Every structure is written in C-alpha cells, then in structure tokens.
Curated annotation (Swiss-Prot):
TM regions (residue ranges): 7-25
Binding site for ATP: Q107, K123, T222, L223, W224, L225, E294, D309
Protein known as: Glycosaminoglycan xylosylkinase
GO cellular component: Golgi apparatus; Golgi membrane
Reactions mediated catalytically: 3-O-(beta-D-galactosyl-(1->3)-beta-D-galactosyl-(1->4)-beta-D-xylosyl)-L-seryl-[protein] + ATP = 3-O-(beta-D-galactosyl-(1->3)-beta-D-galactosyl-(1->4)-beta-D-2-O-phosphoxylosyl)-L-seryl-[protein] + ADP + H(+)
Length: 409
C-alpha cells in the first residue's frame, strides 16, 4: 500500500474512532464501558416491575435479614434483587409491634418496630397528590409519596444508595394506638371523625397534626439500615444558609468547587463524585433541602453518600430549581456511568420507568402526570449542563471513569 493510501486509511480510522467516542458520550454503545452500562440498564429495566403481594419463597431468613445482607459500603441493595418485591410487601403489611415518636429531625414521623424487631420510619400523608407547594424550594411539610418516588428513582438511575421505601395504609386505631408509647399517644386527637397525631419534632405542633381518613392513614415506610452499619453525619458543602439575605459561599463564588476539592473527604476517593450524582438526583426530584448527608462511619472516605430523607421533593412540578445542580455545573465533572445512564433515560424513558416501578405500590399513583413530565424536562436540563461543560473544557475533563465497587465484608 502506498504511503498516501496509508495516510488516508489512518485518517479514516481516526475519524471513525472520534465518531465512536462522540457516540458514546451522547449515549451510544461504542465502547466496553458503554456496553457494560447498557447491560446494567437492560438488567434494571427487566427488574423494574415488582410483583404485587410477593412473598419470600424460602423461610430460612426473614425479609429483614435478606435486606440487611444486601448492604455494603457502596450500595444499600445490589443490582440483582429478586426478593425486593417480597421485602417491600413485608414492609407494607407486617404487624406493628411498637410505635413511638420520631425524635430526630424537623418533620413529623413515627418510629415503628415491625414483627421480627425491624425498625422503620413512618411518614404520614400531609397533602393530596396534586397539591402544589409554593414558596421556597424547601418549603412545606414532608411529602410521603416523594420518599417512595425517590427510592424508585434511585433504582432507575442505578445508584442503589437509598433505603427501601414503600407506601402503606395504617389503621391508627387498631394498628398503632394499642402498641404506642405514652409519649406518642399523648399527641393523638380527633378532628371530626378523623384520627390525627402531631408527634414530637422541631416543627411539630398540636395545631398542625396529620390526619387519617377516619382511622386509616396513608404514609410511607422506610426500612431502617442495619445497626452494624452506623451512620456518620456530614455538612453538605453546597448546603444553604436558610437565612434571608445571607448567601452561602457557593452561591456567589463560581470557583468554589476548587476549594472543595482541597478539603477531605472530597480531595480523594469517590465522595465528590457522589455529591455530584446526588445533585443530579435532587434536581430531578426537586429537593433543595439536603443541608447535611450521611455516610457509613469509619469509611476513610470510601463509603457512598446515602440518599436519606428525600421527602422535601416533588413539591412544585413547574419549578426547576437550577441551584440544586451547583455541584455539577461548578465542578463540571460527572461519572461516565451516570452520564451513560442519563442518556439512556431521555426521550420519555425516565417517566415511563417511574410509572412502571411504582405501578404496584400500595400508594399508587405515587406521582401526578405533571411531576412525571417534570422528571423528563429536568433530565434534559441535566444533559444540557453536562454538554455545556464538555464544550467548555472537553469531554476528557468532564466525564470521569470511576466504578468503585467495594466487596461486602
């Protein structure tokens, strides 16, 4: 082959390789990384629907023991969980052995112990589904359905960092009051024919109780993480001040991410990329209230950022609070696997997946059509933000290969 022909062939090969890279970066299937991500996506799609009323096919372990064994440093549950539907069904139906106030936090909740000694958090329904929360993006009561939807979004995104959540209808008169502590019982009252309680928390008031319809209250049940995995609380580097007229540094300093990169645990390991993943997750659900976050203790910075307390979400489907994405657009970096997953979810796939994932939840419909539409719209905003970063600094500086999978102990 003549030199000129060789040069032409080489140029053609380089051109095709460049096209393949662009194809990958826009959600294609051209590399080993993208093929792996596509296989993971197809696996998620296949397991998305959860059978109604499922039960474990064996009796060697309780549902709680099964779920406890799933937890590892980088995941709350693995990518293959054939028992997930059975565990969620147990959460939605198991007998309540004890009920107490939920002491920590600012919002109303109850701490329950289910049959077999499993602790769970019950968050009551405060709004009808189509209620729009006005005001600040973190305004309003907790939304129980937001906890449910956020868990399933965690599944869809492939993060697997959120505790298990399911909807449940609880009879306060027959299931809760007979096993309630005196402290919880003292907060029960009647509004007409409806049984209500206001619990104990920073913002809990007798004048603002949560009320059942008659005796039956809709809510969400969140599975308590195993005690062998104690949590450590961290101040979120992109947290808000919650004080009128006072901005956090990230709100006025566009170079703030460079300062964060010099602080542990963000100067090494996966934590900063976890924060960026979380900003995408929170933007999609409209959660502007992640002022702190939890990881596992004594992790040396290797633990995942656990997606706890997602109830200040899905408040206003018309509001896309871009400031939630500050970690993404200020750091201008994101995991390749996250980028590939987001591209596979565009074009209405995300909202369709959410409908499918929540179809058999006891609290279905979990989200209104307006909130499902907002998910797809916000996803487009995330993709546009990443593309802008790639145009500014190149894909090689924006898309980070980080697939840290730590083995279970």
């Amino acid at each position: 082959m003549k030199l000129k022909q060789r040069v032409v062939v080489l140029c053609a090969v380089l051109f095709l390789l460049g096209l393949a890279k662009v194809f990958l970066l826009d959600g294609g299937e051209g590399s080993a990384a993208s093929r792996r991500d596509l296989r993971a996506f197809r696996k998620m799609e296949a397991s998305l629907s959860l059978a109604k009323g499922a039960r474990l096919t064996h009796t060697l372990q309780s549902p709680w023991e099964v779920a406890a064994q799933w937890v590892g440093p980088r995941e709350v549950y693995p990518d293959e969980t054939p028992e997930l539907a059975a565990v969620l069904n147990a959460l939605a139906t198991a007998h309540v052995e004890r009920a107490d106030v939920g002491y920590k936090g600012t919002q109303l909740k109850a701490l329950l112990v289910l049959d077999g000694g499993q602790k769970v958090v019950f968050k009551p329904k405060r709004y009808v589904r189509d209620y729009v929360v006005e005001g600040e993006p973190y305004a309003g009561y907790d939304r129980h359905n937001a906890e449910i939807a956020a868990f399933h979004l965690d599944r869809i995104l492939g993060f697997r960092r959120a505790p298990l959540v399911v909807g449940r209808f609880m009879n306060l008169r027959t299931e809760i009051k007979p096993v309630a502590t005196d402290q919880l019982l003292s907060t029960f009252l009647m509004h007409g024919n409806n049984t209500c309680f206001y619990g104990k928390c920073y913002y809990c008031r007798e004048t603002e109780p949560a009320c059942a319809e008659g005796d039956v209250m809709e809510g969400s049940v969140t599975l308590w993480l195993p005690d062998v995995w104690p949590l450590q609380k961290h101040r979120h580097p992109w947290g808000r001040t919650y004080r009128e007229g006072k901005l956090a540094r990230w709100e006025y300093d566009e170079s703030y991410c460079e300062a964060v990169k010099k602080m542990p645990p963000y100067d090494a390991g996966p934590r900063l990329l976890d924060v960026i993943d979380t900003s995408i997750f929170d933007y999609l659900i409209g959660n502007a209230d992640r002022h702190h976050y939890e990881s596992f203790q004594d992790d040396g910075g290797a633990s995942m950022l656990i997606l706890l307390d997602n109830a200040k979400s899905f408040g206003n489907p018309s509001l896309d609070e871009r400031s939630i994405l500050a970690p993404l657009y200020q750091c201008c970096m994101v995991r390749v696997s996250t980028w590939n997953r987001l591209n596979l979810l565009k074009g209405g796939v995300l909202s369709s997946a959410m409908r499918q994932a929540t179809a058999h939840d006891p609290a279905f419909p979990v989200l209104t059509g307006a909130h499902l539409t907002a998910l797809d719209r916000r996803l487009n905003g995330v993709l546009a933000t990443v593309r802008q970063c790639m145009e500014t600094q190149g894909s090689e500086n924006t898309l980070i290969e980080d697939r840290m999978n730590l083995p279970h102990p």
